[in-house]
């Protein structure tokens, strides 16, 4: 019922708005010529005219044939006085008859009084009209919004470069009737009701107003039960208070329900319309409408006794008001169809008025605008050498800094400066020598409001007054008399003056000033305009052209708008968006995109519609090798027990997923598959078994509908899954729980119909009987698959295209997609309007252009690529246009950007269909593939549209040609229908990109042995089964890789056992340097020592050994060593590969055997020999791989540092260090010779003491150990930190520790 009432209210408001629009449009006869019937004095101009005033009429051919000023410059204007306020709906222009003088563009201004002019605006910008191309043709413009004014000005902007300014003009419209009331700031109009209370379900209040002040109450009404409605000006903005039947919400304690408008104290007319139907309301200020819902408990507004306009009088206290009264004029004031001002004029008994008059008295205030921050200034003369000075004026600005006033004082008194610095007013009197005087006052004065300033100096004291609040007077420190100067410079300084005449330590002022007084005398600024008083540069006289660039607010997604005089900025902090207008999301649109950018599992924010209106939502992305699961948690994932519920008193739980339903729907709709698990445990608690078919328990999904199907069943069938399969505990029922047994049973299963997910409510009504109880759990929402990221099509002909509805993006437009092609050029997409258009194309094999026209001329952006874009690889394009800038991005190439004009924000008006892959002319179409097309964040389903069009095929194969490089460490790219995956079979790593290291902790007694007698069955690539490592033939190329971390030296890392007692061992010597010891042919063993750097330092190090024929290269971290065998050496058939301690010691090289006694204590990761990953086989495929594990092997990540206690224990120096014959070809540049005898002696002493301490510690620990430890392989563990885990491994060493103890003794 509430939704129906809300819909009713919205429909009524829409119809009401259309009715008001119809009233405006119904005046279709308002197009009569207005200027032709007036006397010649109707026309006037800025300065000289070549002929009489009457010659400016349209089609005038006599005399000079029109208006043409002597000087053609930007200060000229032609003005028409239409006698009274009229409604102007159109204008027309011609050039001067029989001449080469015409205007090619112009602006319109209008005024009620001939002063305080106002620009005609359209689309929130000062509108420029297209003028004439010759002297005789008439160019007619119908105004989008009519003007109501007495005076109209035509202001030429550009004219024929081969002639001068010349115009003949006409204005079209009709008479305008209005009822006006003038409020002096102390008066009100009261509309008394015939009954005590006026109760209304619908209200329409409309009026127009012009205000002299920034604050004041326009209307107010209230009731005894808390109802109230108030419209109030607050600092130049309209604040609306509206409350229905809520006694707690009093006007004095509430905040405005809606705030709209800005700069409404500009003494121009502004329109207001308030429409309410029940709790639904529309509030419109100057054609900008905001819809809102009122506060309160009922739909009726109950107002007692009266409505007041212009103020809130206090009952029984005449002349007393609750808030500041309105000072200004109101026009055409209507309350629910009643013309309030007309009743007051006719002195009807319902109206009680204070000091209200019925004509608008407007003071002749002339404002001026300082336009340029470098060259604007106003010079006004003063009376020099007066004892003291007095200057006052009002200003308004958006800039924090600017010069307000500079004047050179007489008699060596110095220079007086008044500047705005950081929004604070600062008065300085600077002396030629010595210190001056300084006064500061105010803050935030760049708020766009009018502020009054007064400076008074007498004798040696100076007073600065801001907004009638005087700052502390400052004495002039020199005690010297202050004398006034002869010239006062406002806003800036001319370029030709010295610093003593006009000093400006800051940039010129940009803003408005008015009511300038010097020596208590007002200055006539019209005389300044006419050249008879003072001097000026870059000023607009008789208008204040301040504009609120934050209204409307172009900062999207909650971005905060800040502005200066010329532009605005968006602060996007904490919004989740970035860019000039906070348009671009900083988050990706799905877990698939995070995977594509190299991320692994974790919590991420997902913004399903990108730059669209939906905000980001936190999800968990479980990115694995086969599927990518997106999980959204809710507020009740634990098992919940329920008792005492009945149909009369049901149990209900609402699930909160941390986001709106629209966000969740977008996530689900963008996924291929979604599910939620339900576990319902029951004891004498039924689900569906009722006599009338009404379920006892149900759940509610996304569309707010009840769903009584459970556990694997299907919609529309009121059963559980076991009922469909006929497998319930009691086949007489369709659910296990419906058997109503005293024992616990359950119905558990998955909901997977996307149109019904997510589960939002659970309702249970059958747990109020004896021993009746239920327990339920709804799992998180889980989805996989991305319907958008791999949504691709192929265009096969230049004439083929896809068409979509018109792209609506008036102020913000972003387009992104991937493409690949072999063609030389082609149009990606195009959308046309009457004048506007946008086009995105590959103009050459290395260039992409984005062309857009929003009505002010085409803008073309170009990105040139240093590599060809037609290489049949996927490339990414993103084009964006907003009111601040236009940009084009291709791949990761430099961004092409063009800033927009600050003077106008044009809407993009497109009318045709959007053509993708081609153009409306079916020429220059794109040949190739496109995918993942997004328009303003919304996905465009290319595949579905391609099914309806010829020449376009759904899908596009060949992803691995672009993305195979994403598969690392030997991983292989595998094509999929939608995208690709990485096969990590031949990689020592795992994960979606084969980047996740597989690593394990080793005890001194741990041994991992991989046997090579036969290939193991885990290998997925059958071609590897014939690898030479399984045969008796030798390989010419071999590769060994491993990462290690240890604090033990000496130690053994890896051992390769070949036939005929040949071997290769990777060791750390006693000083921690890396050694490669091998015997690959008959003869003695050889050893390569890579470096004397201590690698047993608790950090991860990487070793890679590559053999190619007689050459062998060894890379250790960032160092590379190269060697050549002196004789032919081959890697013969391997028998086994051992990590850690070698268990088969028969025939073991004596030197290796000595190190092998200690085993390996530390961490190994990413171990690989050719295509074999022995550590991965031991941890992932131990049941089928030919691998044997002895001792404790614990899976854990290798950390980069170890606990300090570990480092203190494990560096062991042994006198039994294996020594062998050094290869003669080992490079001397990468080795360090033996230490001196003195250093060796010191080390020996330190080593002996260390051995003793370690031996005592090990004996103490050994007494607390088990007497026997069986060989085992631990299952996968994830310790919180490696340091703690590693320390425990060392502290709890097994029997190998005993061996080490005996070895040291």
UniProtKB/Swiss-Prot annotation:
The terms describing its cellular component in GO are: cell junction; membrane
Please list the GO biological process terms of this entry.
Answer: cell adhesion
Q: What is its main location?
A: membrane
Q: Where is the F5/8 type C domain?
A: 25-174
Protein's UniProt keywords contain Nucleotide-binding: no
Please list the residue ranges annotated as the Fibrinogen C-terminal domain. Answer: 584-790
Against CDD domains, the record matches this protein to: EGF_CA, FA58C, LamG
Q: What does this protein do?
A: May play a role in the correct development and proper functioning of the peripheral and central nervous system and be involved in cell adhesion and intercellular communication.
- The protein's superkingdom reads Eukaryota
Q: Which residues cross the membrane?
A: 1238-1258
- Keyword Cytoplasm applies: no
Q: Where is the EGF-like domain?
A: 546-583, 957-995
Protein's name according to its UniProt entry = Contactin-associated protein like 5-1
Q: Pfam families under this entry?
A: EGF, F5_F8_type_C, Laminin_G_2
Q: Where is the signal peptide?
A: 1-24
Q: Where is the Laminin G-like domain?
A: 180-360, 367-544, 791-956, 1014-1198
User: Which PANTHER family is this protein grouped with?
Assistant: CONTACTIN-ASSOCIATED PROTEIN-LIKE 5, PIKACHURIN-LIKE PROTEIN
Instruction: Give the glycosylated residues.
Output: 282, 496, 571, 622, 1057
Family label: Belongs to the neurexin family.
Topology relative to the membrane: Single-pass type I membrane protein
């Amino acid at each position: 019922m509430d939704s129906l009432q809300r819909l009713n209210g919205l429909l009524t408001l829409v119809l009401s708005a259309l009715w008001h629009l119809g009233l405006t449009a119904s005046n279709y006869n308002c197009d009569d010529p207005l200027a032709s019937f007036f006397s010649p004095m109707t026309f006037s101009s800025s300065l000289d005219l070549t002929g009489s005033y009457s010659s400016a009429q349209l089609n005038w051919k006599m005399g000079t044939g029109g208006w043409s000023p002597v000087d053609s410059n930007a200060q000229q204007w032609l003005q028409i006085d239409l006698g009274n306020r009229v409604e102007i709906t159109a204008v027309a222009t011609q050039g001067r008859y029989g001449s080469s003088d015409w205007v090619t563009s112009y602006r319109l201004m209008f005024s009620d009084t001939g002063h305080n002019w106002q620009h005609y605006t359209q689309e929130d910008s000062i509108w420029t009209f297209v003028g004439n191309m010759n002297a005789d043709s008439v160019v007619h413009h119908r105004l989008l919004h009519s003007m109501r004014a007495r005076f109209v000005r035509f202001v030429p902007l550009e004219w024929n470069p081969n002639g001068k300014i010349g115009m003949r003009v006409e204005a079209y419209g009709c008479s305008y009737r209005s009822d006006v009331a003038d409020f002096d700031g102390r008066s009100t109009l009261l509309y008394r009701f015939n009954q005590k209370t006026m109760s209304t379900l619908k209200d329409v209040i409309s009026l127009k107003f012009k205000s002299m002040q920034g604050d004041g109450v326009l209307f107010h009404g209230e009731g005894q039960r808390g109802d109230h409605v108030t419209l109030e000006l607050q600092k130049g903005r309209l604040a609306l208070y509206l409350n229905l039947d809520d006694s707690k919400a009093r006007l004095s304690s509430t905040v405005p329900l809606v705030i709209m408008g800005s700069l409404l104290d500009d003494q121009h007319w502004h329109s207001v319309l308030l429409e309410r139907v029940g709790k639904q309301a529309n509030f419109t200020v100057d054609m900008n409408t905001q819809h809102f819902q009122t506060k309160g408990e009922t739909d009726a507004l109950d107002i007692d006794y009266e409505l007041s306009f212009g103020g809130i009088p206090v009952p029984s206290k005449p002349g007393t008001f609750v808030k500041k009264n309105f000072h200004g004029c109101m026009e055409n004031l209507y309350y629910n169809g009643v013309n309030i001002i007309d009743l007051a004029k006719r002195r009807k008994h319902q109206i009680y008025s204070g000091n209200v008059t019925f004509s608008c008295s407007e003071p002749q205030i002339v404002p001026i605008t300082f336009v340029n921050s470098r060259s604007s200034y106003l010079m006004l003369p003063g009376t020099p050498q007066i004892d003291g000075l007095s200057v006052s004026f009002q200003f308004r600005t958006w800039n924090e800094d600017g010069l307000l006033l500079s004047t050179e004082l007489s008699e060596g008194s110095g220079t007086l400066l008044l500047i705005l610095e950081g929004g604070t007013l600062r008065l300085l009197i600077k002396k030629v020598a010595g210190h001056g005087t300084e006064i500061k006052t105010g803050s935030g004065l760049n708020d766009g409001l009018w502020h009054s300033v007064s400076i008074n100096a007498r004798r040696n004291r100076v007073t600065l007054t801001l907004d009638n609040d005087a700052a502390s007077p400052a004495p002039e420190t020199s005690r010297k008399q202050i004398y006034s100067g002869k010239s006062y410079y406002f806003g800036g300084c001319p370029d030709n003056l010295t610093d003593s005449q006009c000093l400006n330590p800051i940039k010129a002022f940009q803003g408005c000033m008015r009511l300038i007084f010097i020596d208590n005398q007002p200055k006539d600024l019209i005389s300044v305009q006419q050249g008879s008083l003072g001097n000026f540069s870059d000023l607009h006289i008789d208008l204040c052209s301040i504009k609120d660039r934050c209204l409307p607010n172009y900062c999207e997604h909650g971005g905060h708008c800040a502005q200066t005089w010329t532009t605005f900025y968006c602060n996007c902090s904490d919004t989740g968006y970035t860019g000039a207008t906070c348009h671009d999301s900083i988050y990706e649109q799905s877990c698939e995109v995070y995977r594509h950018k190299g991320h692994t599992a974790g919590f991420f924010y997902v913004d399903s519609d990108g730059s669209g209106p939906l905000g980001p939502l936190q999800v968990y992305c479980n990115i694995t090798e086969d599927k990518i699961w997106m999980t959204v948690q809710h507020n009740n994932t634990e098992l919940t027990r329920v008792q005492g519920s009945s149909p009369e008193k049901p149990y209900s739980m609402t699930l909160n997923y941390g986001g709106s339903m629209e966000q969740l729907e977008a996530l689900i709709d963008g996924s291929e598959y979604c599910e939620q698990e339900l576990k319902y445990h029951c004891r004498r608690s039924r689900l569906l078994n009722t006599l009338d078919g009404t379920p006892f328990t149900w759940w509610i999904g996304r569309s707010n509908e009840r769903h009584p199907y459970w556990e694997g069943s299907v919609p529309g069938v009121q059963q559980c899954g076991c009922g469909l399969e006929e497998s319930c505990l009691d086949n007489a029922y369709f659910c296990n729980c419906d058997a109503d047994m005293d024992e616990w049973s359950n119905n558990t299963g998955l909901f997977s119909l996307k149109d019904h997910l997510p589960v939002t409510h659970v309702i249970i009504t059958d747990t109020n009987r004896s021993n009746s109880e239920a327990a339920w759990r709804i799992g998180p929402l889980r989805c996989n698959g991305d319907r958008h990221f791999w949504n691709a099509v192929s265009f096969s002909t230049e004439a083929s295209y896809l068409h979509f509805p018109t792209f609506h993006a008036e102020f913000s437009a972003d387009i992104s997609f991937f493409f690949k092609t072999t063609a030389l050029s082609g149009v990606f997409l195009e959308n046309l309007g009457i004048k506007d258009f946008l086009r995105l194309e590959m103009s050459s094999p290395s260039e992409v252009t984005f062309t857009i026209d929003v009505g002010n001329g085409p803008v073309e952006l170009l990105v040139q690529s240093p590599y060809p874009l037609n290489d049949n690889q996927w490339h990414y394009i993103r084009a964006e246009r907003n009111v601040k800038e236009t940009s084009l991005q291709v791949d990761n190439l430099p961004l092409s950007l063009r800033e927009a004009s600050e003077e106008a924000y044009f809407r993009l008006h497109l009318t045709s269909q959007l053509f993708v892959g081609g153009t409306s002319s079916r020429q220059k179409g794109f040949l190739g593939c496109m995918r993942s097309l997004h328009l303003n964040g919304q996905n465009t389903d290319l595949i579905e549209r391609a099914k309806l069009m010829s020449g376009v095929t759904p899908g596009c194969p060949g992803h691995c040609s672009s993305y195979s490089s994403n598969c690392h460490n030997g991983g292989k790219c595998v094509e999929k229908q939608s995208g690709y995956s990485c096969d990590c079979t031949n990689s020592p790593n795992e994960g979606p990109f084969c980047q996740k290291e597989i690593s394990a902790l080793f005890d001194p007694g741990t041994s991992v042995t991989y046997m090579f007698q036969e290939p193991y069955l885990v290998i997925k690539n059958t071609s590897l089964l014939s690898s030479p490592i399984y045969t008796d033939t030798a390989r010419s190329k071999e590769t060994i890789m491993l990462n290690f971390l240890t604090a033990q030296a000496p130690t053994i890392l890896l051992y390769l056992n070949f036939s005929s007692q040949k071997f290769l061992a990777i060791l750390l010597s006693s000083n921690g340097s890396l050694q490669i010891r091998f015997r690959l042919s008959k003869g003695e063993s050889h050893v390569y020592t890579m470096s004397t750097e201590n690698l047993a330092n608790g950090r991860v190090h990487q070793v890679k050994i590559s053999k190619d024929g007689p050459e062998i290269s060894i890379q250790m971290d960032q160092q590379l060593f190269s060697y050549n065998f002196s004789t032919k050496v081959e890697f013969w058939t391997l028998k086994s590969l051992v990590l850690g301690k070698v268990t088969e010691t028969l025939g073991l090289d004596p030197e290796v055997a000595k190190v092998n006694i200690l085993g390996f204590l530390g961490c190994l990761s990413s171990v690989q020999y050719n295509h074999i990953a022995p550590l991965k086989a031991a941890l992932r495929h131990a049941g089928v791989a030919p691998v044997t594990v002895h001792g404790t092997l614990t899976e854990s990540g290798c950390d980069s540092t170890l606990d300090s206690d570990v480092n203190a224990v494990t560096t062991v120096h042994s006198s039994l260090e294996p020594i062998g014959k050094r290869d003669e070809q080992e490079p001397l540049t990468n080795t360090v010779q033996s230490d001196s005898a003195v250093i060796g002696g010191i080390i020996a002493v330190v080593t002996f003491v260390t051995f003793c301490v370690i031996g005592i510690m090990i004996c103490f620990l050994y007494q607390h150990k088990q007497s026997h430890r069986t060989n085992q392989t631990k299952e996968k563990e994830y310790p919180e930190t490696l340091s703690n885990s590693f320390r425990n491994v060392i502290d709890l060493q097994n029997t190998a520790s005993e061996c080490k103890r005996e070895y040291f003794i």
